[in-house]
Amino acid sequence: MSQAIREATHAGSWYLDDTELLTKQLKSFIKNPTPETGKRFVISPHAGYMYSGKVASQGFQQLDFSKIQRVFVFGPSHHIFTRKCLVSRASICSTPLGDLKVDEDLCQKLVASDNSFDSMTLDVDESEHSLEMQFPLLAFHLLKQGCLGKVKIVPIMIGALTSTTMMAAAKFLSQYIKDESNSFVISSDFCHWGRRFGYTLYLNDTNQLEDAVLKYKRRGGPTSPKIYESISNLDHIGMKIIETKSSDDFSEYLKTTQNTICGRYPIELIMKSMECANFSERFKFISYAQSSHVELVTDSSVSYATATA
């Protein structure tokens, strides 16, 4: 039976398609060559590597794949609307650094489990960058630890889940959280700020979050704090909630601020799954950056952050 190959459709544009050059670039992002024992979870950005690759690498380099048999990859949908978790139909996900084998049996098991999961077409899969941008990073670090070819992946596009669907999916996934042979990659950028994103929230007081949310409309920009500092404050409040509080608290933060964290549902799902599994480890953010420092309302930026557990 022929295998369905998910091609590296964003190679050559979002990241380098040359094996040697991509390897050299990813090596340049590494600070600490030794993974941390037992780290199995990472929140990782999904912009072009020239923008977010360094931040993403700070998380991936901590992952310990020595005992891992399977890596779940959660990513949001940028092109279609769905209320479900859509599982890849591919047999192989291609990268310039080597192929990643998909755990087809588990993908089929997820789809058959309940109404929370369904499968996505190969066209939908290949159009979505949030999953693909994790694949070369994953392949690089698996190869580095001598695990490429030994580990299978489970790519899942996470839709705009209702609370009921979120809980059902989390309960089912909790069994895989408990199993230490599983690792999880959660794909998400943080704040998308600017008129082109329809989001120009300005936070001038981090101590009074609900009262401090303003829509800034002048042509210029505030000076205390500067807009990029406000964006950072806004993101870091959310990051602190991910580190120390519950998935429900994170949901409330998003309702209050409307922060444009594109991977909000993948993040909520992994937090809820950890809670259902009574998993004690918490995410710790280790790197944060912005694509540019916004000072004027006419400017824009995207934030990138990575955390591990």
Curated annotation (Swiss-Prot):
Q: What family classification does the UniProt entry report for this protein?
A: Belongs to the MEMO1 family.
Which InterPro entries does the UniProt record give?
Answer: MEMO1_fam
Q: Name one Pfam family in it.
A: Memo
Q: Which Gene3D superfamilies match?
A: LigB-like
**One cellular component GO annotation, for this chain's record?**
cytosol
Signal peptide boundaries:
none
What PANTHER family does the entry give? PROTEIN MEMO1 (PTHR11060:SF0)
> What's the protein here called?
MEMO1 family protein C4H3.04c
Classification via HAMAP family: MEMO1
